Amino acid sequence: MDLLIRLGFLLMCALPTPGERSSRDPKTLLSLSPRQQACVPRTKSHRPVCYNDTGDCTDADDSWKQLGEDFAHQCLQAAKKRPKTHKSRPNDRNLEGRLTCQRVRRLLPCDLDIHPSHRLLTLMNNCVCDGAVWNAFRLIERHGFFAVTLYLCCGITLLVVILALLCSITYESTGRGIRRCGS
């Protein structure tokens, strides 16, 4: 029960408050930890380049929208080179939805103040917000926190009841066997 209370507390802490930005907000999506950031490769048109160690960007006069489009293009190129063993999700009908998180993290721009284009945001939603943690958040967003907590409580209670029944059946069968042997 203590574990369930702690789990509920952690979920409450993880949920954004009404005044707080959502985890799917563009700025939040781009504000990943430095380990997840990578540099946009330098192109012939001399786009802004970031350095992983310092996070310093040069040639920042270029338009943010163009940088976002360049990043989206890099993501698509990376997706085309992905291994064929990678399974795409059933809802994905286009190449942009079948990107892997690792490829996107490798291509993320270092500058956290970038104003991304709509296409870039679509890529970020498909690539970064993927995996077990994001699926849990989506479940909470879809059904509500209390409904998900209720599902968890019911599931854990059902599991405990099943284990208790199995233990009691096992105990009764072994107890009768011991009595027979002793008589």
UniProtKB/Swiss-Prot annotation:
<dbReference type="GO" id="GO:0140313">
    <property type="term" value="F:molecular sequestering activity"/>
</dbReference>
<feature type="topological domain" description="Cytoplasmic">
    <location>
        <begin position="166"/>
        <end position="183"/>
    </location>
</feature>
<comment type="similarity">
    <text>Belongs to the cytomegalovirus US6 family.</text>
</comment>
<feature type="signal peptide">
    <location>
        <begin position="1"/>
        <end position="19"/>
    </location>
</feature>
<keyword id="KW-0325">Glycoprotein</keyword>
<keyword id="KW-0244">Early protein</keyword>
<feature type="topological domain" description="Lumenal">
    <location>
        <begin position="20"/>
        <end position="144"/>
    </location>
</feature>
<keyword id="KW-0945">Host-virus interaction</keyword>
<keyword id="KW-1043">Host membrane</keyword>
<dbReference type="Pfam" id="PF17616">
    <property type="entry name" value="US6"/>
</dbReference>
<keyword id="KW-1107">Inhibition of host TAP by virus</keyword>
<keyword id="KW-0472">Membrane</keyword>
<keyword id="KW-1080">Inhibition of host adaptive immune response by virus</keyword>
<keyword id="KW-1133">Transmembrane helix</keyword>
<dbReference type="InterPro" id="IPR035129">
    <property type="entry name" value="US6"/>
</dbReference>
<keyword id="KW-0812">Transmembrane</keyword>
<keyword id="KW-1015">Disulfide bond</keyword>
<keyword id="KW-0393">Immunoglobulin domain</keyword>
<protein>
    <recommendedName>
        <fullName>Unique short US6 glycoprotein</fullName>
    </recommendedName>
</protein>
<comment type="subunit">
    <text>Interacts with UL18.</text>
</comment>
<feature type="domain" description="Ig-like H-type">
    <location>
        <begin position="30"/>
        <end position="131"/>
    </location>
</feature>
<dbReference type="GO" id="GO:0016020">
    <property type="term" value="C:membrane"/>
</dbReference>
<feature type="glycosylation site" description="N-linked (GlcNAc...) asparagine; by host">
    <location>
        <position position="52"/>
    </location>
</feature>
<keyword id="KW-1038">Host endoplasmic reticulum</keyword>
<feature type="transmembrane region" description="Helical">
    <location>
        <begin position="145"/>
        <end position="165"/>
    </location>
</feature>
<dbReference type="GO" id="GO:0044167">
    <property type="term" value="C:host cell endoplasmic reticulum membrane"/>
</dbReference>
<feature type="disulfide bond">
    <location>
        <begin position="39"/>
        <end position="127"/>
    </location>
</feature>
<keyword id="KW-0899">Viral immunoevasion</keyword>
<comment type="function">
    <text>Inhibits peptide loading of MHC class I molecules by transporters associated with antigen processing (TAP). Does not prevent peptide binding to TAP, but binds to the lumenal side of the TAP complex and inhibits peptide translocation by specifically blocking ATP-binding to TAP1, but not TAP2. Also prevents the conformational rearrangement of TAP induced by peptide binding. In consequence, infected cells are masked for immune recognition by cytotoxic T-lymphocytes.</text>
</comment>
<keyword id="KW-0732">Signal</keyword>
<dbReference type="GO" id="GO:0046776">
    <property type="term" value="P:symbiont-mediated suppression of host antigen processing and presentation of peptide antigen via MHC class I"/>
</dbReference>
